[in-house]
């Protein structure tokens, strides 16, 4: 077990923020808009997972570009979700949404740009892995192929894009339908985090299905927690694609803790548990009562 202190978790978040800050020099209004979107008060959970999985594997491989890719995908999805034609949100990450400040045209271009940059970062991380010592340099091509397949599936019409569609146009407000939205819209991007951290961190490719199970349990717990905390607001807005509103708060709480325990158990089985993952799990339980 790799022990990472809470301060190290904070240091990693600071490093991610520094990399994000320098990713788009403010040469024009588009880059300014992208910087505005990515430099909010986000918790950086998805890129953190990439870094933590790779570090726990102990191979000392650089996965920082893959970590940025996940934050780019995530931010791109938030920009699109916030648009008037979607969820019509006015606030995101404690400040006005991107389209409120820069207009819808620049918001759309920012979302497109972040998605393409995310794929470029994945390619760059593959090139970085080629420079590593053996056996990792020989794994780089397959790692990049796996990462690109995972990212395109999880962010595209088989993943988060379809999830947003089903969220906007729900067929039924039943537990099965809501679980499908969670699987497509939330779990997919977490799958990207765990898988990219694993393959670019030098993990055993034969364990990928179990790594995806990690994402499934973590992503479900993560979304259930959000739904529990958002129950009152979602009820007022008549947003019924909320699992806690459908099954009730207590059942949702029980499901949350079940998923979290499955996640922690599988972390240990894959030998990638760490003090930082434990800290993240503790943070997820905060404010739940």
Q: Positions of the model-derived regions?
A:
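N-terminal amphipathic/basic leader segments beginning at the initiator methionine
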Residues: 1-21
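Mg2+-dependent prenyl diphosphate-binding active-site environment of isoprenoid biosynthetic enzymes
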Residues: 21-225, 231-267, 273-285
């Amino acid at each position: 077990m790799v022990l990472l202190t809470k301060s190290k978790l904070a240091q990693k978040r600071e490093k991610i923020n520094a990399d994000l800050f320098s990713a788009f020099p403010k040469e024009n209004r588009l880059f300014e808009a992208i910087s505005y979107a990515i430099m909010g008060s986000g918790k950086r959970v998805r890129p953190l997972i990439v870094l933590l999985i790779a570090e726990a594997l102990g191979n000392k491989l650089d996965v920082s570009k893959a970590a940025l890719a996940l934050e780019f995908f995530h931010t791109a999805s938030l920009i699109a979700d916030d648009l008037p034609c979607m969820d019509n949100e006015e606030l995101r990450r404690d400040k006005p949404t991107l389209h409120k400040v820069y207009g819808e045209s620049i918001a759309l271009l920012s979302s497109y740009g972040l998605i393409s940059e995310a794929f470029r970062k994945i390619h760059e991380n593959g090139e970085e892995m080629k420079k590593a010592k053996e056996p990792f340099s020989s794994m780089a091509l397959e790692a990049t192929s796996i990462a690109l397949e995972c990212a395109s599936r999880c962010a595209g019409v088989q993943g988060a894009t379809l999830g947003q569609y089903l969220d906007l146009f729900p067929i039924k407000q039943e537990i099965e339908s809501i679980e499908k939205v969670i699987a497509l819209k939330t779990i997919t991007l977490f799958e990207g985090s765990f898988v990219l951290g694993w393959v670019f961190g030098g993990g055993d490719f034969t364990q990928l299905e179990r790594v995806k199970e990690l994402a499934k349990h973590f992503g479900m717990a993560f979304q259930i927690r959000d739904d529990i905390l958002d129950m009152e607001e979602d009820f007022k807005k008549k947003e019924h694609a909320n699992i806690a509103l459908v099954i009730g708060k207590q059942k949702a709480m029980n499901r949350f803790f079940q998923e979290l325990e499955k996640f922690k158990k599988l972390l240990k089985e894959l030998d990638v548990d760490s003090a930082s993952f434990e800290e993240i799990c503790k943070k997820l339980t905060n404010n739940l009562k």
